[in-house]
A protein has these predicted regions:
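Active-site-proximal cap/loop segments of hydrolase catalytic domains
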Residues: 1-129
Length: 129
């Protein structure tokens, strides 16, 4: 961001920080981090949750910034495919073997749909989006 989050560079944080701009996100977000970076990402995760954005968070223990362990890379690729199929196509890939994953995602979807219906209701006034 070009410097610390105060002084002359504060505006960069206000403009580009994912956490400080979470209210602008309306699409489901899949977050995948290694154990060393996961703590730094929690602020963004919590901000998305606060604004009712469907978000799921996975941590790959003992891995690097770029998923290096083959089993983690495979899991990440599969999870990303599942995520896109679920949110974009409405499909569940082998739901019996991934019941926890899909149960969680269905709950996220139901919460998002409930939030959308409240925001669009006549009593809510103008659309918030």
């Amino acid at each position: 961001m070009g410097g610390p989050p105060y002084g002359e560079t504060l505006k960069n944080y206000l403009n580009y920080s994912m956490s400080l701009n979470a209210e602008r996100i309306h699409s489901p977000v899949l977050m995948e981090y290694d154990s060393m970076e996961a703590l730094d990402a929690m602020e963004y995760y919590e901000a998305l949750q606060h604004y009712g954005v469907p978000v799921d968070f996975y941590v790959y223990p003992n891995d690097g910034h770029v998923t290096e362990r083959p089993e983690h890379r495979f899991m990440s690729m599969q999870r990303n495919l599942d995520w896109f199929e679920f949110w974009l196509l409405g499909r569940e890939n082998d739901p019996s073997s991934k019941s926890d994953q899909y149960t969680r995602w269905r709950q996220l979807k139901a919460l998002a749909e409930k939030k959308d219906s409240v925001e669009r209701s006549p009593s809510a006034g103008n659309l918030t989006r």
